[in-house]
């Protein structure tokens, strides 16, 4: 039986309703020469086996992260994800579930969201966390908007160590909200004067640690300076594993902590989906964007979980909403929660220690290569080196040898005089042989 979605009578009635004589009239804004009159000459359909082989040939052109020594970071990190994480999140109760608007049938989802919030608050040293954002960049953008609401001021200062993609999200939002954004020049060694830029118009100071170049920052002096000026300090991170070893931003005085949670429980995923983390102090709770899961008692006095304080535009008047983000990264935050639960506090610290040790070992080896200059003094699992010549050329040459060497800074900051800089990350997945291969290949490439 054929499926006929539209009869001639249906078409005539619809055209009459919208007031046009023909279907072609609906497309009159498109130049006639640009319209597709006949179907293109596409190849005939293929069987499943043929399609799989064709796609396999295409994918074989890529140098996969799993098939080569991989030192790429700059905001997305390759970590080992236990098989149990993927197995559990693929259960249909999690994989296919929708927003838990009906708590009486969604206690499982609500409970893991509550546990996720608890873990994020503990990791960041804050008092409350939301149910996640799209990713670290959108969390940063929402944090800046939250700071504007809280302080009634309209200027944000972005550190020169903030990931350029995060800065682009903030400036894109500011173009529509009318707020001012001051983006500091690239700060390769975390030595910029941020305190001197604070004034009575500043709502927030946004500082990343570890920053995009790998530098670790002491946030306490910045937090003290911000308090004196009535400015909110927003601490950003892109590598969540660092929180297993580095002092929590909240414990250093940050007012809002945001970042990317991809490196716990989530694979690289071609750049997404990821999971944005957002935490703050209890006194700012009502201006925190996104969803919040709370614990309560039901009519029979039993412990239960519900969505609470959802001041999104779906729930209240748009002009009163704290955010127009319409969802959270539910499955990704479940993966985060499962992995972190499996690790535990000691496991996370051990994982972070291994990451740091691998990075220090690699940095020491590379610093001994003639022509290589290490720019960082303190770092976690990522650092920046200066090379003779264009870093992009060296990366391409090493990729041809089967080594993914890192991210040229010129890709993140084109035209900023950073052509000779390379960001390198080393995590627990990089073996001693991997690190030795990178050092040897780069030394030969430079010689």
Swiss-Prot record:
It catalyses: N(6)-[(R)-lipoyl]-L-lysyl-[glycine-cleavage complex H protein] + glycine + H(+) = N(6)-[(R)-S(8)-aminomethyldihydrolipoyl]-L-lysyl-[glycine-cleavage complex H protein] + CO2. It is an enzyme of class 1 (oxidoreductase). InterPro entries: GcvPA, GDC-P_N, PyrdxlP-dep_Trfase, PyrdxlP-dep_Trfase_major, PyrdxlP-dep_Trfase_small. Keywords: Oxidoreductase. One of its GO terms (molecular function) is glycine dehydrogenase (decarboxylating) activity. Its EC number is 1.4.4.2. One of its GO terms (biological process) is glycine decarboxylation via glycine cleavage system. The glycine cleavage system catalyzes the degradation of glycine. The P protein binds the alpha-amino group of glycine through its pyridoxal phosphate cofactor; CO(2) is released and the remaining methylamine moiety is then transferred to the lipoamide cofactor of the H protein. The glycine cleavage system is composed of four proteins: P, T, L and H. In this organism, the P 'protein' is a heterodimer of two subunits. Belongs to the GcvP family. N-terminal subunit subfamily. NCBIfam families: PRK00451.1. This is Probable glycine dehydrogenase (decarboxylating) subunit 1. It comes from Beijerinckia indica subsp. indica (strain ATCC 9039 / DSM 1715 / NCIMB 8712). The gene is gcvPA.
